[in-house]
Regions:
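Short, charged, amphipathic alpha-helices and their helix-cap/turn boundaries
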Residues: 2-21
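Domain-terminus/edge residues, biased toward the C-terminal soluble/receptor-binding domains
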Residues: 17-21, 33-232
């Protein structure tokens, strides 16, 4: 189990959860040992996990029925927003003595995907719904970068990933896109494009260049020499 917690911590750091430490896989207090995190880190984790189709299916399931020869079992998801709020697509409830009621939820409307996290909140379901209603009204999804051609000082440059963000109109106006060129562009990567808002970086992607391979035309004697080399 210690090894699994080690892997969990490595993954957490890999997705930017810099204020999180896991000591076990359950998330529960274990004597003097305690898992700790922040609402921001939990939002990063949930936003990352919801992109996994199996995870999304599990956390978005309202109830599941299992029949055996002896009995039928029905389990209900404790995330009440799945039933009471039409835009909710998943989430996870929790409780510990120190953190009290914890709730992580995800919601999606008109292409805008949001995550809300609360700790020690006795009105968590109501607060989550209120926050979603507030920000769905002011946020729009913008495609910041599109996979394919990108304008640089070189011809035939492109990126291999698209990038979208949910922003207010004011945030969109303040968004910065910066192209950084590498000194050595002998490879097919000539630099990177960086997207930031209020000095915080949100996305970085390598910029590639399509280098044309020119066909070398051989004269009659060069063709003979080439053929002799191939035979030997």
């Amino acid at each position: 189990m210690d090894n699994f917690a080690y892997l969990m911590n490595n993954k957490a750091k890999g997705i930017g959860m810099n204020n999180t430490t896991f000591v076990n896989s359950s998330g529960l207090e274990d004597g003097d040992k305690a898992n700790y995190s922040t609402v921001y880190d939990m939002a990063l984790l949930s936003g990352y996990a919801i992109n996994n189709s199996l995870y999304k299916q599990i956390v978005g399931t309202k109830e599941i029925t299992v029949k055996t020869d002896l009995k039928t079992y029905v389990w209900h998801n404790k995330n009440k927003l799945l039933s009471s709020y039409k835009y909710c697509v998943g989430g996870k409830t929790g409780f510990t003595e120190k953190a009290r009621r914890t709730l992580v939820t995800n919601a999606s409307s008109d292409g805008v995907n949001l995550t809300v996290v609360t700790f020690n909140d006795g009105n968590d379901f109501g607060d989550h719904k209120d926050l979603y209603e507030k920000y769905f009204d002011v946020l729009n999804e913008y495609e910041i970068l599109s996979e394919g051609p990108i304008k640089t000082k070189y011809d035939n440059t492109y990126i291999s990933r698209s990038f979208k963000m949910s922003l207010t109109k004011d945030e969109y106006k303040k968004l910065k896109k910066e192209i950084i060129y590498y000194d050595d562009n002998a490879s097919n990567i000539i630099g990177k494009v960086k997207v930031s808002l209020n000095d915080k970086e949100y996305f970085t992607e390598d910029i590639y260049i399509k280098k044309e391979v020119k066909e070398v035309k051989l004269n009659f004697f060069q063709k003979i020499i080439k053929r002799i080399k191939e035979l030997w």
